[in-house]
């Protein structure tokens, strides 16, 4: 049995440093790299792909809303056509640096509010998938396990990656608890490890109300901007290895 381990990275820009990419990238198997709209810039994009190449880490695009001030975590009122163009623009940016370094993208994962907004919104999910398909139909699409984006990807005949979150709590509907709520994040390492093990080994998640619901886990996400990220990644890998579960790029 194996599982992919991903993190959202490349989120520094200019003089502002976010996350600990240099320490995390050698440990994970897939990196979701900001493309300059919600975070990141041309230098950071270049450096992050260099790091991925050096450590054999799978490269993924992490396109978000054009909202540096809100870190892409605020909803923007955009038409489906605008979203499709937004995704295409960001895919072009990261692909240019992949070409520069002789690398290829493996997957695409929308960021933040854009990712969450696909839940129950088939039109938005289809706009994102169409942009990716028209850019490169071989790219995999990462979305919340069993969600609208995953279904839209599969309907297009593309490969979907069912993602679960090590550091986020879930609602009874299988969506992520809003960051506006105090219990959105999991801050304790042991709780995160138990959370991951239940999802990967048992294909279940315990929701915020204590209910167990079924889900599929293809890839585990740890948010790279969190202060606990590096410790979480190390603990998760150790626990999975002890369970005989191999961590590798999907």
UniProtKB/Swiss-Prot annotation:
Domain of life, source organism: Bacteria
CDD domains: LamB_YcsF_like (cd10787)
InterPro entries documented for this protein: Glyco_hydro/deAcase_b/a-brl, LamB/YcsF/PxpA-like
EC number: 3.5.2.9
Cystine residue pairs: none
Catalytic activity: 5-oxo-L-proline + ATP + 2 H2O = L-glutamate + ADP + phosphate + H(+)
Enzyme class: hydrolase
A Pfam family the protein falls into: LamB_YcsF
Keywords, in A-Z order: ATP-binding, Hydrolase, Nucleotide-binding
GO BP: carbohydrate metabolic process
Single GO MF descriptor: 5-oxoprolinase (ATP-hydrolyzing) activity
Function, in words: Catalyzes the cleavage of 5-oxoproline to form L-glutamate coupled to the hydrolysis of ATP to ADP and inorganic phosphate.
HAMAP family associated with the record: PxpA (MF_00691)
Complexes and interactors: Forms a complex composed of PxpA, PxpB and PxpC.
Family from the record: Belongs to the LamB/PxpA family.
NCBIfam families: PRK05406.1-3 (NF003814), PRK05406.1-5 (NF003816)
Protein name per Swiss-Prot or TrEMBL: 5-oxoprolinase subunit A
The organism of origin for this protein: Macrococcus caseolyticus (strain JCSC5402)
């Amino acid at each position: 049995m194996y599982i992919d381990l991903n993190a959202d990275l490349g989120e520094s820009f200019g003089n502002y440093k976010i996350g600990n990419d240099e320490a995390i990238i050698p440990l994970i198997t897939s990196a979701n790299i900001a493309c300059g709209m919600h975070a990141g810039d041309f230098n950071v994009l270049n450096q992050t792909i260099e790091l991925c190449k050096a450590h054999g880490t799978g490269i993924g695009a992490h396109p978000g809303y054009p909202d540096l001030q809100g870190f892409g975590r605020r909803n923007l009122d955009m038409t489906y056509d605008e979203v499709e163009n937004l995704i295409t623009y960001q895919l072009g940016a990261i692909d240019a640096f992949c070409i520069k370094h002789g690398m290829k993208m493996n997957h695409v994962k929308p960021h933040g509010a854009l990712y969450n907004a696909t839940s129950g919104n088939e039109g938005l999910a289809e706009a994102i998938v169409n942009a990716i398909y028209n850019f490169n139909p071989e790219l995999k699409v990462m979305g919340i396990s069993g969600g609208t984006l995953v279904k839209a990807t599969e309907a297009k005949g593309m490969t979907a990656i069912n993602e679960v979150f090590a550091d986020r709590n879930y609602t009874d509907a299988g969506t992520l608890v809003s960051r506006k709520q105090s219990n959105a994040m999991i801050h304790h390492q042991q709780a995160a490890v138990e959370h991951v093990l239940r999802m990967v080994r048992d294909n279940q998640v315990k929701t915020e109300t204590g209910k167990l619901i079924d889900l599929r886990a293809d890839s585990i996400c740890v948010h790279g901007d969190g202060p606990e990220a590096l410790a979480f990644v190390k603990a998760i890998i150790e626990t999975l290895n002890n369970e005989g579960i191999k961590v590798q790029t999907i």
